[in-house]
Amino acid sequence: MQAVQQEIAQALKVQPPFADAAALEAEVARRVTFIKGCLANARLKTLVLGISGGVDSLTAALLAQRAINELRAETGDKAYTFIAVRLPYQVQHDEHDAQACLDVIKADEVHTVDIAPAVRALAAEVVELKNGSPTLVDFVVGNVKARTRMVAQYTIAGARAGLVIGTDHAAEAVMGFFTKFGDGACDLAPLSGLVKNQVRAIARSFGAPESLVEKVPTADLEDLEPGKPDEASHGVTYQQIDAFLHGQPVDQAAFDIIVATYRKTQHKRELPFAP
């Protein structure tokens, strides 16, 4: 492991690879306990999470629903609730995957909020977007989608006295692959410190089908490039990112991209600048 790999892995609190099935189950139990503790500390009984159809939100939701199930069993209090939220922009091209995720999660409640009217209304009011290039406008509006989704989740959480769950993990964090104050905003991040392969392994341990576990990851925020794979944006694969974070050798080109991207996106992982 090179020094910079160790530095980044420590900063992101990257967890070691699962040694075996028992280690995986112990990590699942630890993270479920973490979720339960967050609710106890906040003196709240509701969790809210947006379900995209990808493995990250699927895995976070499975952990959340298990935490809620355990709290109800332990306390006898039926007020504990997990709310899964679908947040499509009109009709999502992979809606069938999102519905398949919901079938696996079996959330206590499922809400759907179409973010398109809000996103379009805001975009129409911003003069700077009227003369921008199509590519720039598409990128900016893509971030508006992510932030609108988080506004919707916090609106539901506020109305139901709940906490919002985030889906960020180490393989996305190192690349700064989230929208600031969008999907990067949350009250708790139960996947933090995990690499992508570990997220998939946890989903698999819950019995999620391989079609969802191994689905090609996509943020799917840009209309001009619908379903664009994360890895196309990264310039490296998740396998390479995972290997880097676990201190394993990666080719020099991938190494340089990961380090440069980590440094360039440092501001996204920090609190706002202050004097």
From Swiss-Prot:
Biochemical pathway: Cofactor biosynthesis; NAD(+) biosynthesis; NAD(+) from deamido-NAD(+) (ammonia route): step 1/1
Residues annotated to bind ATP: 50-57, 167, 196, 218
Enzyme class: ligase
SUPFAM superfamilies: Adenine nucleotide alpha hydrolases-like
Keyword Ion transport: no
Gene Ontology MF annotations: ATP binding; glutaminase activity; metal ion binding; NAD+ synthase (glutamine-hydrolyzing) activity; NAD+ synthase activity
InterPro entries xrefs: NAD/GMP_synthase, NAD_synthase, NH(3)-dep_NAD(+)_synth, Rossmann-like_a/b/a_fold
Binding site for Mg(2+): 56, 172
Catalytic activity, reaction form: deamido-NAD(+) + NH4(+) + ATP = AMP + diphosphate + NAD(+) + H(+)
Enzyme Commission code(s) on record: 6.3.1.5
Superkingdom field: Bacteria
Swiss-Prot/TrEMBL GO biological process terms: NAD biosynthetic process
Annotated deamido-NAD(+) binding sites: 147, 180, 187, 267-268
Gene Ontology CC, one term: cytoplasm
Sorted UniProt keywords: ATP-binding, Ligase, Magnesium, Metal-binding, NAD, Nucleotide-binding
Matching Pfam families: NAD_synthase (PF02540)
Xref: Gene3D superfamilies: HUPs
Coiled coil residues, start to end: none
NCBIfam families: nadE, PRK00768.1
Family, per entry: Belongs to the NAD synthetase family.
Role, per record: Catalyzes the ATP-dependent amidation of deamido-NAD to form NAD. Uses ammonia as a nitrogen source.
Subunit: Homodimer.
Protein name as it appears in the record: NH(3)-dependent NAD(+) synthetase
Gene of this entry: nadE
